[in-house]
Amino acid sequence: MSEVDLVIEVMDARIPFSSENPMVAELRQHRPCIKILNKSDLADPEITKMWLAHFDKEQGVKAQALSVLDKSKTKNLPNLCRKLLPERGTAVKSIRVMIMGIPNVGKSTLINTLAGKTLAKVGDEPAVTKEVSSGQHRIILDGNIALSDTPGILWPKIENENSSYRLAVTGAIKNTAIDFEDIALFAADYLIDAYSEKVIERYKLKQCPQTGIQLLKEIGRRRGCLRAGGIIDMQRASEILIHEIRSGALGALSFETPEMIANETASINAD
């Protein structure tokens, strides 16, 4: 980190707190930081505004919402780097930028857009860039900006249990390491509380179910997830819900707000 002037941390706009690696703040120390709320097209725009305001209050931090649907903002990142470090970015002094982020937050897509060509493989499963991007550690961008990539790594212990669920729901944890029924139940309960109208519209319901179990059963019935004897296949129904959340089929969803996280953190600290 001694040769880094600025850090870009890429997070998932649907779960900014849960996808923010706490080790980044320790590593960057006094260096300015651009926090990217990526995949903002999949996140609730009103809640994204709350998060941008929240992060902009931090010392030395500028937050920016980005989406693959609008590459112009991504391509403007070098200009933002120069604004944060006006004394660098000249022919004499380049701005040395390190880009960091947990798996599957869209870091590879961001790098490819900035570079104007494919340097890192893009995929829906975490850690697909590990082997492909080796040897592509340093990228020279427009305006004498040197961008260094780092592997996407989850920190060893996640203290907030709800964050673990949110990371699984949005795809930051490999499918082979999760219980679909467990995380789908978590997601279903949240959607009933926060986005009941979208649930009703997507699954053509007369009214929103009272519980997550009931919602998963409704999805199973309406999507033909039935076993012998008409028993609902809860595994298949769970996979459908998680897939439709990740793909944006349910609309723009956010799974945490600054106020929600403040309350959860206070509860954890009290214990």
Residue ranges and their predicted role:
Residues C81-R88, L114-V122, P126, L154, ...:
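Short, well-ordered alpha-helical segments in soluble proteins
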Residues L27, K39, I111, A115:
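Short, conserved active-site entrance elements at the starts or edges of catalytic domains
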Residues I34, S40-I102, L119, G224-L226, ...:
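Canonical P-loop GTPase G-domain recognition
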Residues V97-V122, T150:
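Glycine-rich phosphate-binding P-loop
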Residues K73, G106, A146:
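Short phosphate-engaging motifs
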Residues V92, T113-L114, I139:
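Solvent-exposed alpha-helices and their adjacent loops that cap or buttress functional pockets
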Residues M1-L6, A13-C33, S40, E46, ...:
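Helix-rich effector regions associated with P-loop NTPase G domains
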Residues N76, L80, T109, T113, ...:
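Alpha-helical scaffold segments in soluble metabolic enzymes
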